[in-house]
């Protein structure tokens, strides 16, 4: 009796708010627990996600070779070997260009330092040479005083390299299995779901993976265009290390909106040191032009409906990923959102296969 009286005394709005509140708290607690588990197994989760992203980029050529009658194992092997050959060739060429262009950059930097020193002495500042030398000596002394920290940083870098090598091996191992038997793996994983929803979950996975394929293809084309534009501009201006800087822009462009800009900042610094403030400002204008071309033409054209994410969601996802997992988190944030955006739409839809009907079934056979 008292319970019913108590319920009757509570306003309906309060009861509904309380019901939603405890459900929200349960969902929030589950998300926190999931993030905690992912953080504990980061050394496994991150390589698996990277392998999934790489598989989305490599599945289309594997499917193309399959459609030409090549055995699946041969197609996977050929695509992987071709990818390694292209990546190794690019890295070798970039490193050789960096080594060849470094002396010229050092010469230009020394010339810029001499020009700045003359300006500080002869310009409005009217500094004495002794003052500038003392400032340089103070900087050298500060480096010596922090030598222990720099040494420990080098040791931690060595440990990081070991972790990176281990992660790279795990990525390669996982990637091979995703390319060779991704569909079987996904079919096996979905057996954990009840039979009544199993088909819908499988369709959601296919839709999410289709968005990953679209995202990987579009991001690769955008990154290639950004790198070509920036590299060509730097080469025309005669900025040293144009090709290595363009390569940094290419890899940075895989983090949407901010990656290419952050990588391009280094190009601005090199242009400033090597060619002066005028060329640095031109480089800034070049980066802005490339960024506008990417935002208003390339991304809407090449991504299309496969990755329809609001720009605010992209920014928030990158920020959250960066806070949770650093650069890797920022790299994986947007494709993760793209995956769940399509997958959830299919899970909530009436026909689990409607949203993936327009995607080539060949591209989905690896999920």
From Swiss-Prot:
One of its GO terms (biological process) is transmembrane transport. Its main location: membrane. The chain crosses the membrane at residues 18-38, 41-61, 74-94, 161-181, 228-248, 249-269, 270-290, 314-334, 337-357. InterPro entries: AI-2E-like. Belongs to the autoinducer-2 exporter (AI-2E) (TC 2.A.86) family. It holds the Pfam family AI-2E_transport. It is a multi-pass membrane protein. The keyword tRNA processing does not apply. It is found in: Cell membrane. Keywords: Cell membrane, Membrane, Transmembrane, Transmembrane helix, Transport. This is Putative transport protein MT0215. Coiled coil: none annotated. One of its GO terms (cellular component) is plasma membrane. It comes from the Bacteria.
């Amino acid at each position: 009796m008292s319970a019913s009286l108590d319920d009757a005394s509570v306003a309906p709005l309060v009861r509904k708010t309380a019901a939603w509140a405890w459900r929200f708290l349960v969902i929030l607690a589950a998300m926190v627990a999931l993030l905690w588990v992912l953080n504990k197994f980061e050394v496994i989760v991150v390589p698996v996600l990277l392998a999934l992203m790489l598989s989305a980029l490599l599945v289309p050529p594997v499917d193309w070779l399959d459609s030409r009658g090549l055995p699946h194992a041969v197609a996977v092997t050929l695509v992987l070997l071709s990818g390694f050959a292209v990546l190794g060739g690019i890295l070798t060429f970039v490193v050789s260009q960096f080594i060849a262009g470094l002396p010229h950059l050092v010469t230009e930097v020394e010339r810029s330092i001499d020009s700045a020193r003359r300006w500080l002495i002869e310009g409005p500042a009217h500094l004495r040479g002794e003052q500038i030398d003392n400032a340089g000596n103070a900087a050298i002394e500060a480096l010596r005083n922090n030598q222990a920290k720099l040494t420990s940083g080098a040791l931690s870098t060595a440990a990081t390299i070991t972790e990176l090598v281990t992660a790279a091996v795990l990525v390669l191992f996982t990637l091979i299995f995703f390319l060779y038997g991704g569909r079987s793996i996904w079919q096996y994983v979905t057996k954990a779901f009840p039979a009544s929803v199993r088909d819908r979950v499988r369709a959601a996975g296919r839709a999410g993976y289709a968005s990953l394929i679209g995202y990987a293809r579009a991001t690769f084309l955008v990154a290639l265009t950004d790198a070509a534009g920036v590299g060509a501009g730097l080469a025309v201006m005669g900025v040293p290390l144009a090709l290595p800087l363009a390569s940094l822009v290419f890899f940075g462009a895989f983090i949407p909106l901010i990656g290419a800009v952050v990588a391009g900042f280094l190009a601005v610094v090199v242009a400033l040191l090597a060619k002066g403030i005028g060329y640095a400002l031109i480089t800034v204008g070049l980066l802005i032009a490339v960024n506008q071309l990417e935002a208003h033409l390339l991304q809407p054209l090449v991504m299309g409906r496969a990755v329809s994410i609001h720009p605010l969601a992209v920014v928030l996802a990158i920020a959250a990923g960066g806070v949770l997992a650093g650069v890797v988190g920022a790299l994986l944030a947007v494709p993760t959102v793209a995956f769940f955006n399509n997958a959830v739409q299919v899970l909530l839809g009436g026909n689990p296969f409607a949203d993936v009907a327009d995607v080539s079934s060949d591209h989905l056979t690896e999920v």
